[in-house]
């Protein structure tokens, strides 16, 4: 339960649903509890995080049990613990990968700039490929500097479109598209540019100030007009504090490489548990000291 509410709060900060901005209190106030508590982003984050915790616990149990085998102590207990932990770990690792796919889809829908940074993806296209492995160009500093994003990359064709839109032919916007806007959205509207969002944010900030001033002066008519303008632009409120559109782009190298480290570790854990299960059932794991070291070193 504690993990659920922590991750609900985290998901809300990344995709605020079930709330409205109250200009009288200058706060976002909840209007739909269940929209907050059961948002798709929160659900995905909960299962992905909890399952990842189970993977960690399983790795720890296998590693400690292999330490007992390495010391030639409590052999029966250690082997029984390894069998249970490896099965739990394998199931959790596979399910974690599945929920990770769901998290990727939610990021694509609600935080497309984060997805673009995760992929080092600057120019949108239909049937976009997913970078399986790549080396970013360290000379590329901004989205519009004209330099290639990669020195080298290996790509899985159309997989990014499949991840982001569940359609291998779908258009996925890149960093440049998200900054410049102009591409069609699924609701039939056209995406705003970052500069347009900044202007709307400034309009919202101005309307909020006008509303507070009108209320303080007792001018309800002006307050209603300002409240209407604020409501129309409040979704872009935060953009009004942005000075340069490049501030909206995350640290691409950090995001790109850390995402791949996470994916590689996920693949490693699945392979690790498969090997452990094979050895504990088909071989004499208690005599395989090299595997004891692998298991112990996997803990950190």
For every predicted segment, state its role:
Residues 1-300:
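Polytopic transmembrane helical bundles with strong interfacial aromatic enrichment
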């Amino acid at each position: 339960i504690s993990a659920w509410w922590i991750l609900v709060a985290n998901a809300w900060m990344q995709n605020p649903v079930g709330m409205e901005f109250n200009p009288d209190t200058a706060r976002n106030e909840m209007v739909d509890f269940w929209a907050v508590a059961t948002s798709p982003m929160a659900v995905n984050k909960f299962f992905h995080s909890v399952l990842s915790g189970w993977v960690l616990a399983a790795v720890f149990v296998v590693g400690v049990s292999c330490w007992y085998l390495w010391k030639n102590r409590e052999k029966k207990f250690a082997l029984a613990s390894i069998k249970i932990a490896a099965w739990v770990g394998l199931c959790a690792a596979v399910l974690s990968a599945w929920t990770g796919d769901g998290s990727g889809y939610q990021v694509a829908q609600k935080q497309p700039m984060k997805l673009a940074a995760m992929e080092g993806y600057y120019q949108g296209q239909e049937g976009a490929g997913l970078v399986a492995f790549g080396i970013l160009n360290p000379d590329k500093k901004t989205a519009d500097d004209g330099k290639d994003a990669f020195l080298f990359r290996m790509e899985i064709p159309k997989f990014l479109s499949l991840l982001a839109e569940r359609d291998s032919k779908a258009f996925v916007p890149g960093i440049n598209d998200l900054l410049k806007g102009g591409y069609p959205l699924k609701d039939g509207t056209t995406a705003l540019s970052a500069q347009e969002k900044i202007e709307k944010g400034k309009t919202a900030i101005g309307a909020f100030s006008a509303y507070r001033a009108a209320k303080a002066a007792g001018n309800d008519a002006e307050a209603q007009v300002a409240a209407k303008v604020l409501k129309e632009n409040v979704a872009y409120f935060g953009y009004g504090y942005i000075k340069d559109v490049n501030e909206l782009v995350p640290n691409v190298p950090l995001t790109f490489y850390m995402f791949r480290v996470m994916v590689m570790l996920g693949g490693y854990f699945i392979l690790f548990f498969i090997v452990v299960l094979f050895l504990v059932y088909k071989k004499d794991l208690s005599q395989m000291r090299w595997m004891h070291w692998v298991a112990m070193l996997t803990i950190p």
